[in-house]
């Protein structure tokens, strides 16, 4: 009997202890909200951007534009042009979600990001009308969910569209800045699901393809009307040829099948994933600025580093312009290493795992360079520029011999 009571006491203590951990981590991290009071200026950009960033470790979304023309830039860790040659391999822009609400021109701008549950909210106010939305990239499914609503009098019309990267996103300044041929399509199904895809299959070492599809509630063409008390929701699904045999059909199907009950489960699992993530370790210090930056860094890492074979590029998942500087590659010095320094001490092992994969994939090439360059057989000498799946971003090529003879 005493043994049974002891076991019960241990169970109750464990439950209380777990509840205490949840409460402590939530109390610390919920204090930290990232606030933007004006639209970002450095987007699209070949480097890092100054925009609100969302992601799930596979897909990244960067928010741009004024209230009347919100743009969601979409990129994926596994969507590259993959060719072992200098300046021919780099991460790509998949596409853009363009949310147009002309009546909001001149409205105030406020975007806030809550780190604890990885949810972003926006509020735009003009005169006696306000439009707001809540959005997140699901941590457990490759989905972006956006819920729009309005306050005030009357109604507001809007339109959502998917677009491929254009002149702002793709640099074309030959001979040094080259554009390589891709296949692409943007369209709408008879059921009103918007979709687009891009693929790089010509003159590459490894073919790549990525797709996204968006469905807007009660809309057959992307148009919608906001009225007080009547929220409108849109769902966008993402995939690639590395995650699905037919990524286009996959995203169209998943966007079509997102019922209200399913999305409630998606949000629940999303919140649970982030709650578990923050409980892996947490700390509170007297310096609130440093503490906030610490948790912001962990938020960013969880948002971009979960795909083992495809680590985030040098600027994270959030690619908004092609070609990113330094090909956006895994520069095998502190540039690739530094983002992972604190992940073991903070117990974020899942986010650290992708670090090793580009180097492991280059072992056979490293053996070749070791013997050819140093005369040491069975050694490993890696190039400075690496991509995923054994790709070299700095391999000698006719282009290199022509324009970089020094």
Model-identified regions with their sequence ranges:
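Well-ordered alpha-helical segments within folded domains of soluble proteins
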Residues: 333-344
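Active-site lining segments of carbohydrate-active enzymes
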Residues: 347, 354-406
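Hydrophobic alpha-helical segments
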Residues: 4-6, 54, 294, 336
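Acidic/polar, glycine-enriched structural segments that form the non-catalytic walls/loops
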Residues: 15-330, 348-355, 359-371
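Bacterial Sec-dependent N-terminal signal peptides
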Residues: 1-23
């Amino acid at each position: 009997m005493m043994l049974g009571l002891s076991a019960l006491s241990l169970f109750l203590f464990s439950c209380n202890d777990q509840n205490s951990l949840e409460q402590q981590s939530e109390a610390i991290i919920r204090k930290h909200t990232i606030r933007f009071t004006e639209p970002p200026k450095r987007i699209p950009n070949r480097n890092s951007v100054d925009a609100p960033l969302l992601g799930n470790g596979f897909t990244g979304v960067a928010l741009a534009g004024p209230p009347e023309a919100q743009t969601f830039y979409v990129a994926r860790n596994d969507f590259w042009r993959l060719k072992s040659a200098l300046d021919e391999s780099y991460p790509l822009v998949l596409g853009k979600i363009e949310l147009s609400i002309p009546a909001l021109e001149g409205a105030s701008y406020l975007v806030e990001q809550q780190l604890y549950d990885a949810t972003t909210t926006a509020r735009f106010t003009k005169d006696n009308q306000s439009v707001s939305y809540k959005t997140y990239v699901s941590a457990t499914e490759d989905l972006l969910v956006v819920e729009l609503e309005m306050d005030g009098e009357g109604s507001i019309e809007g339109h959502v569209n998917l677009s491929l990267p254009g002149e702002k996103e793709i640099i074309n300044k030959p001979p040094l800045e080259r554009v390589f041929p891709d296949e692409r399509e943007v369209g709408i199904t008879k059921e009103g699901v918007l979709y687009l895809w891009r693929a790089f299959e010509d003159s590459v070492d490894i073919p790549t393809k990525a797709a996204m599809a968006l469905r807007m509630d009660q809309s057959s063409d992307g148009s919608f009307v906001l009225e007080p008390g009547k929220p409108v929701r849109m769902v966008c699904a993402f995939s690639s040829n590395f995650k699905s045999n037919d990524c286009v059909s996959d995203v169209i199907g998943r966007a079509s099948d997102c019922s209200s009950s399913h999305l409630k489960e998606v949000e629940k699992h999303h919140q649970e994933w982030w709650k578990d993530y923050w409980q892996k370790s947490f700390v509170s210090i007297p310096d609130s600025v440093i503490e906030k930056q610490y948790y912001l860094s962990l938020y960013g890492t969880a948002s971009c580093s979960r795909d083992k074979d495809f680590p985030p590029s040098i600027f994270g998942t959030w690619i908004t312009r092609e070609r990113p500087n330094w090909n956006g590659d895994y520069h095998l010095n502190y540039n690739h290493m530094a983002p992972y320094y604190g992940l073991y001490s903070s117990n974020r092992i899942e986010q650290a795992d992708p670090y090793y994969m580009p180097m492991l994939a280059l072992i056979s090439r490293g053996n070749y360079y070791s013997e050819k360059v140093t005369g040491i057989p069975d050694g490993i000498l890696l190039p400075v520029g690496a991509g995923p799946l054994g790709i070299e971003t700095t391999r000698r090529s006719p282009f290199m011999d022509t324009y970089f003879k020094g």
